[in-house]
Amino acid sequence: MATQTELGAVVSLWRYPVKSMMGEELNAAEVTTRGLRGDRAYALVDGKDGKVATAKNPRKWPQLFDFRANFIDHARSGAQAAPIRITLPDGTMVTSEQEDCSQILSRALAREVMLDAVGRGDEETPSSAFPARAANAEEYWPDMEGLDFRDTVTDFALPVGTFFDCAVVHLLTTATLDRLGELYPRGRFEVRRFRPNIVVQPASGGTGFIENSWVGHTLAIGDEVRLSVTGPCGRCVMTTLPQGDLPRDPDILRTAAQHNHVQVGVYAAVVRGGTIRRGDSVRRAA
């Protein structure tokens, strides 16, 4: 067995059943080539232009972070179009099985939307309105130094047959959050702002933006899962938006722009699936 370098341990696991809504924290998760089962399994699609709703354009979708989604039956969360429950800002709940689900969501958002699903069954076959082509979405770029665009909205394509922005797994270390907090002490650099799947507590002595050094390497998590770290995670306006008790704070993004090339965390592809659990060790395998 090749020597592996201990990097840390998994301290939290997250998935987001509906794109850009609040998600759910897990004790364990099954990982397939399409990421954590059930992650971004659903999305809202604009009834007028057919684009996927995302908080990346808060001017168009200012309320998405006020909605929360969870799977009704965790045992079925890997099944195609497994039913979910969505809690609206006023506390009303609606399930994906209700015939009037999209109508209820449309009224809450004051915009016609359709709740669409990407199938995540055993065959990992997409079953949505976008099975063979990339869905499109929009991103608003605030007027901020260091961004590729400023004070404008651009279109981007999601990976074919998915509702992910870029990659199927997103990792983040507590060391990065701690470092950002040192650079901007008034900012609340909490996991919720960055929406990762896997949060890693580094081994003793690990500080700073340490996951930057993982790019190009393979990570072993627990006994089964292997991830190939493909690149850094570029951040956007979503990190600045209010959610729950977190206030709007543009300096969250500005701090990342000034000190880490607008990057927080890393993306990964799945080399080998399996189950990961809170507390699992994270090692560099290659």
Task: State where each predicted segment sits.
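Metal-cofactor-dependent catalytic cores
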Residues: 1-286
